[in-house]
């Protein structure tokens, strides 16, 4: 069972969230979009948004821009990468480890300063140069996932920079969609202090931060001078509210205190529809697994245990529990994806086989396997973690596995993930329940299986250190033809499933419940969304 602390954490957001619903000033005189997020705090406002991918959705792609961004204009076609603050990028013909990025001209930060090559170098220094006055260890921990392949960089001219990778790496540019750029002039203005910058942020994005109060609300206003005139927001203001409790979010929408909620309560869908709300879903690149510790001596270092855990859960029943707000997962990507491959280990619900494998590993109903898992109360892509983990706990118990949960705030769980399974805290755990995006090759696979990504360098929390996986990761980075790359990635997913390095459960369909007053919304096949075309009223 979930601990009493879990229940307290789940309910702790209620009074806070309720207080945050006060209507914004002059709400009747201007168009305002009010959104209840699943996170427990306002994502960092300084261009290095925390709170996972939801942080990027609400405080990254709104206030800031990356060099390369996603086209989020379609609900039917997969999102694709397009030019952002960089208009063109290519490898040097004489040295494919060097990438040239030609930068967009005529772009201004919200403080009025000019975006140029110096701004790019400043943001790289922030993460990669510990001797720089701009260096920010907190921001680095967030942004390094986009920058880790880069071993060198330089300014070529006012609107051109060069990035160098350790080896040939054709995947690197796709990572830069998460590298949002802050203003060097504003950093100077606030006294070269990132804490002060967060109080007075400045990006180049379609929205400006008007005000924000930690753990309560942030108010954004549209940037009428945005460089892409087609993406100047149609709504004047957007209010972001951290509301991690799922029931509180649904109640807020039904009562008209917000216009949009992330992840409505599964049992509230009929009531929300009856109240005139729309339930928006779409297939997005996402997986919701247990990331397993492969530390020597851990029970999950035994492949028989790992396979048994994958066979112990009825995924169709979990989807039914969530009222259809999920899709079963038997690998990092859906089975019809070109990256899925052809694993020999077929993940299905087979409790008898799970018991057999556990018995071979020395466990059983009379000698139960005890495991400790770190989970969150809510968070970006975490869906309904308390409900879902209780379901898994019950199913595992039926095959002789007893789960104990360490329940954390989402940001605390992310910090635990970044520390790795070999950290003092990680050694007390058998797995972590962190949802992952699978939007690009690195995020879908390579950050988990590449030994170069063992913390603190990356997200290989379980400490997978396997020559075959390393070889496949290198091959993927050296492959430029998209169809050939698909084949390499399919081999990676095949090996991940055959080795059962995760316990896969479901893929999210990113449900949003939206007031009937909201128009113009496109629900893309992505973790991100373009709020610019949305209107209210």
Regions found by a protein language model. Give the residues of each.
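Surface-exposed binding/hinge segments that line
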Residues: 102, 121, 137-187
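Extracytoplasmic/periplasmic ligand-capture domains
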Residues: 2-3, 28-29, 40, 72-73, ...
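C-terminal segment of N-terminal export signals and the immediately downstream linker at the start
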Residues: 21-38
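N-terminal lobe/hinge region of extracytoplasmic solute-binding protein
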Residues: 37-94, 202-203
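Mature extracytoplasmic/periplasmic domains
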Residues: 184-185, 324-344, 511-516
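Long beta-strand-rich cores associated with HINT superfamily self-processing modules
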Residues: 512-537
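Short, solvent-exposed loop/turn elements at domain surfaces
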Residues: 42-48, 75-78, 171-174, 218-219, ...
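N-terminal secretory signal peptides and thylakoid transit peptides that target proteins
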Residues: 1-14
């Amino acid at each position: 069972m979930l601990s009493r602390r879990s229940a307290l954490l789940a309910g702790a957001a209620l009074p806070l969230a309720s207080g945050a619903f006060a209507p914004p000033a002059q709400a009747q005189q201007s168009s305002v979009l009010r959104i209840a997020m699943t996170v427990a705090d306002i994502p960092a406002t300084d261009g290095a948004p925390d709170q996972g991918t939801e942080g990027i959705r609400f405080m990254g792609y709104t206030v800031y821009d990356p060099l390369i961004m996603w086209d989020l204009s379609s609900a039917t076609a997969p999102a694709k990468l397009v030019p952002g603050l960089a208009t063109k990028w290519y490898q040097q013909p004489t040295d494919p480890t060097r990438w040239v990025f030609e930068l967009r001209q005529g772009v201004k930060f919200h403080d009025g300063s000019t975006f140029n090559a110096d701004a790019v170098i400043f943001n790289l220094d922030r993460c990669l140069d510990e001797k720089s006055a701009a260096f920010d260890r907190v921001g680095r921990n967030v942004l390094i996932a986009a920058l880790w392949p880069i071993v060198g960089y330089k300014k070529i001219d006012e609107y051109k920079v060069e990035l160098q990778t350790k080896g040939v790496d054709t995947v690197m540019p796709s990572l830069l969609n998460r590298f949002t750029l802050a203003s060097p002039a504003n950093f100077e203005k606030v006294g070269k202090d990132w804490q002060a910058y967060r109080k007075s942020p400045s990006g180049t994005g379609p929205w400006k931060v008007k005000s924000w109060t930690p753990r309560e609300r942030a108010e954004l206003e549209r940037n009428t001078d945005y460089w892409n005139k087609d993406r100047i927001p149609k709504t004047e203001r957007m209010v972001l509210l951290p509301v991690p409790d799922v029931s509180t979010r649904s109640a807020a929408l039904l009562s008209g205190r917000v216009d949009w909620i992330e992840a409505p309560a599964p049992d509230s869908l009929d009531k929300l529809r009856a109240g005139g709300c729309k339930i928006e879903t779409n297939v997005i690149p996402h997986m919701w697994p247990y990331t397993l510790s492969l530390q020597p001596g851990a029970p999950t270092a035994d492949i028989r245990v790992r396979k048994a855990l994958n066979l112990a859960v009825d995924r169709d029943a979990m989807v039914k529990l969530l009222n259809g707000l999920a899709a079963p997962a038997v690998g990092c990507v859906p089975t019809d994806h070109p990256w899925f491959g052809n694993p020999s280990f077929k993940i299905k619900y087979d409790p008898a086989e799970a018991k057999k494998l556990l018995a071979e590993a020395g466990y059983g109903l009379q000698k139960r396997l005890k495991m400790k898992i770190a989970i969150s109360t809510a968070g970006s892509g975490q869906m309904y973690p308390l409900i879902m983990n209780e379901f898994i706990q019950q199913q595992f118990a039926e095959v002789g596995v007893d789960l104990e949960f360490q329940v954390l705030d989402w940001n605390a769980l992310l910090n635990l993930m970044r520390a790795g399974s070999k950290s003092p805290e990680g050694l007390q755990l058998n797995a972590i329940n962190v949802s992952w995006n699978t939007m690009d090759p690195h995020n879908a696979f390579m950050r988990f299986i590449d030994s170069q990504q063992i913390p603190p360098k990356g997200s290989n929390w379980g400490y997978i250190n396997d020559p075959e996986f390393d070889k496949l990761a290198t091959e993927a980075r050296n492959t430029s033809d998209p169809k050939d790359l698909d084949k390499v990635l399919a081999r990676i997913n095949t090996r991940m499933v055959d080795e059962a390095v995760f316990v896969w459960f479901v893929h999210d369909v990113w449900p949003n419940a939206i007031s009937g007053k909201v128009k113009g919304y496109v629900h893309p096949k992505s973790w991100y969304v373009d709020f610019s075309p949305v209107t209210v009223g």
